Every structure is written in C-alpha cells, then in structure tokens.
From Swiss-Prot:
Protein name: Putative membrane protein insertion efficiency factor
NCBIfam families according to UniProt: membrane protein insertion efficiency factor YidD (TIGR00278)
Keyword Transport appears in the UniProt entry: no
Location(s), subcellular: Cell inner membrane
Phylogenetic placement of the source organism: Bacteria, Pseudomonadati, Pseudomonadota, Alphaproteobacteria, Hyphomicrobiales
Organism per entry: Bartonella bacilliformis (strain ATCC 35685 / KC583 / Herrer 020/F12,63)
Keywords: Cell inner membrane, Cell membrane, Membrane
Family to which this protein belongs: Belongs to the UPF0161 family.
A GO CC term attached to the entry: plasma membrane
Amino acid sequence: MIEQHPKQGKIQTRNYAGPWRKTPGRLLGTGLIRLYQITLSNFIGNQCRYMPTCSEYTYEAIARHGLWAGAWMGLFRIVCCNPFGTHGFDPVPTSLGSSYYFYKPWCYRKISTKHNK
C-alpha cells in the first residue's frame, strides 16, 4: 500500500492505508494485529501462502468491516493458510453484501475462500 504524506510524498506502508472509521473496536483489533506484526511476525517469518499476508488481510478486513466481521474473515483466512489449503491472491472484499448477518459468522468463510476456487 502506498500512502500520501503531504510533506514527504509517498510512503510505503504494510497495511491498509485507505479511509476507515476509527471506532474503538476497530482500533483495538487493528492495534492487536499491528502488535503481532511488530513482535511475533518477525520471529515466525514470512510463511503465508496468500497475498496480502494473513495479518495484512485481517488488518484490512477489520478496518473496512469492523471488529466482528473482520476478525471472523481473518480467522477463516488463517485456518485456510496451511500446506493443504488454498493459496494465491485473495483481496478483502470492498463490501459484504446483504446476505451477511452478525449472528451468522460462518457466512464470512465464503468471502475469504471464493476468490481462490
């Protein structure tokens, strides 16, 4: 992602740099993902089979769709990221659609796997 900075030009960032509402849940979720990226991710190494990586995907999903939906989307993505799972380019959808409800989190699995079939 490339972010515009008024004085320095373009800055390369690791996570989603688009506009998103800064609600407490989203700030908590993205903060925890960022903490993981700074600490544990460096020790584990880059072993993700997807582009963007699972932590970048979860960060963007939480930023775009909120803590509840974004965390479920990220969880299903992480579960699929294994040697027997899928791989490739899997972007976060820009909108969820009308068939996704907060009380049916298993529907979010369809979003994270439909790009790779």
